[in-house]
């Protein structure tokens, strides 16, 4: 019952984020009362739902240390396979996630910051998802209800798998490919300087540069609404995918590689990089805890490093023909990139 509550609250909080006020405290009574008229539940305020969930998670998490685990629970539990420590970390981490959402403004600001303070100042009492082995996920069963091979649907919706120029701008120091640019490195990935996750996400393209007459190879070309229609049409017609040669146009999400159609890709519910990003923001902004630039930097670097490691882990276990095309960055290279991102002022909004 405790595990079911955690999963329910995770789902419900996400639903509240989308829709706001919802039936909650008096919802789903029909199976219990058989009263149709009484089953039309009133709407609870979003703030009240969040307040309830934050309080419940605080109460639930430590109980996983004391609960007697039923013999058959490990086979019934398709999330954590009966691991009570992971359920405790899941509950605490979900509470941190939700507390951060309300810590900046609104009626629950004080409650959110108090929860953050309580957890971050007592890590032994409130263990979090902080390492890859703590990640919360459902294993892809490849058949039945738990068959969710990553990227299902991308094959039917071409525009949904095109790279975004804005994302590429953030991942490459020389930005999204621009044929009109005087920068010869436009759209080029530079090892040791750029985000190595782009190699697993998107296919590079080759295209004849109308300005120089030369073929620009290994370029990352994302969609950009600010580009003139005529040039967009040229990109669509002339850019050649270097991985899937049947594709023309903008860089696309890599198929049968790290993510799309990788049947080894788990359904991630909560991953350690997110928790370190949340902690970094807490220390940087002083949400619940005293501002601490050194701790914020440490947590940010952990988040970036662990994210890169996670990407390359799923690439390494993929059985697709487009997986493992690139060597994973070394720990030193990953740390250097994370440090460069922390020190960058390019996107200091």
For every predicted segment, state its role.
Residues 302-334:
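Conserved small-residue
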Residues 333-349:
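Acidic, glycine-rich loop-and-strand cores that form catalytic or ligand-binding grooves
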Residues 1-315, 345-348:
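Structured, solvent-exposed acidic/aromatic patches
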Residues 234-235, 322, 337:
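Long, compositionally biased, charged low-complexity segments
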